[in-house]
From Swiss-Prot:
Its EC number is 3.1.3.-. Catalyzes the dephosphorylation of D,L-glyceraldehyde 3-phosphate in vitro. The keyword Metal-binding applies. Disulfide bonds: none annotated. Belongs to the HAD-like hydrolase superfamily. This is Glyceraldehyde 3-phosphate phosphatase. The keyword Hydrolase applies. Pfam families: Hydrolase. Its cofactor is Mg(2+). One of its GO terms (molecular function) is metal ion binding. InterPro entries: HAD-like_hydrolase (IPR051400), HAD-like_sf (IPR036412), HAD-SF_hydro_IA (IPR006439), HAD-SF_hydro_IA_CTE7 (IPR011950), HAD-SF_hydro_IIIA (IPR006549), HAD_sf (IPR023214). It comes from Pyrococcus furiosus (strain ATCC 43587 / DSM 3638 / JCM 8422 / Vc1). Signal peptide: none annotated. NCBIfam families: CTE7 (TIGR02253), HAD-SF-IA-v1 (TIGR01549), HAD-SF-IA-v3 (TIGR01509), HAD-SF-IIIA (TIGR01662).
Length: 240
């Protein structure tokens, strides 16, 4: 009998390639603000924006408004609009799945696995990514921290996801790119864990690496993990 019944995925840089996307979108936003008259050089404005994001978080809705204050400029709605338009146009144009994501999800569905998402972030933004990439039909349940009221690695969000599928922790695997929030968090409630070593967090929080049962560098390698967990002796090969 199959031991693993449910596979949970993080969203950003696990299913959706967002690290590169965000960088390009932010740069295009600054360039467009300057193009429309903002009297600051690119490096000064971009570095200030990065500091602002670091301080307030990526989901803060007033990045460009606050940027003008930080640059000691008078508020100009035209410049803010220029930044917002360029940011969103870039995001919508270049939004991509992580290589191999759809292929892996199709295979999981074909083999009868249940799948869910456990992600941090703004619910509207996260659903927008899921819907624009037409990934919603793959998942029975989607747990988003800002909607659930609790962020990873808090055990409550993982336990709520398990309850939604009516499975025990040992019957589920969590796949994510962040060792602390995804891997440490899931392991603490008794789930199996797969660290997807990908994107900007690939070299961060390495002190939590011991909580990863498996390490993969390409999503299709997850299929080998499942074969091994469900009785096959096949080894999982990671390229990194």
């Amino acid at each position: 009998m199959r031991r693993i019944k449910v596979i949970f995925f993080d969203l950003d840089d696990t299913l959706v390639d967002t690290s590169k996307l965000a960088e390009v979108a932010r740069k295009n936003a600054i360039e467009n603000m300057i193009r429309h008259g903002m009297p600051v050089d690119f490096d000064t404005a971009y570095n200030e924006l990065l500091e602002l994001i670091k301080e307030y978080g990526s989901n803060f809705p007033y990045h460009f408004d606050y940027l003008l204050r930080r640059l000691d400029l008078e508020y100009n709605p035209k410049w803010v609009a220029a930044g917002v338009i360029a940011y969103h146009n870039t995001k919508f144009t270049y939004l991509r799945e992580v290589p191999g994501a759809r292929k892996t999800l199709l295979r999981l569905k074909k083999e009868g696995y249940m799948t869910g998402i456990i992600t941090d972030g703004n619910p509207i933004k996260q659903w927008e990514k899921i819907l624009r990439l037409e990934l919603d039909d793959f998942f029975e349940h989607v747990m988003i921290s800002d909607f659930e009221g609790v962020k990873k690695p808090h055990p409550k969000i993982f336990k709520k996801a398990l309850k939604a599928f009516n499975v025990k922790p040992e019957e589920a695997i969590m796949v994510g790119d962040r060792l602390y929030s995804d891997i440490y968090g899931a392991k603490n409630v008794g789930m199996k864990t797969v660290w997807f070593k990908y994107g900007k967090y690939a070299e961060l929080d390495l002190e939590y690496k011991e909580y990863a049962d498996y390490v993969i560098t390409e999503l299709p390698q997850l299929l080998e993990v499942l074969e091994r967990e469900n009785g096959s002796d096949k080894e999982v090969h990671s390229s990194g």
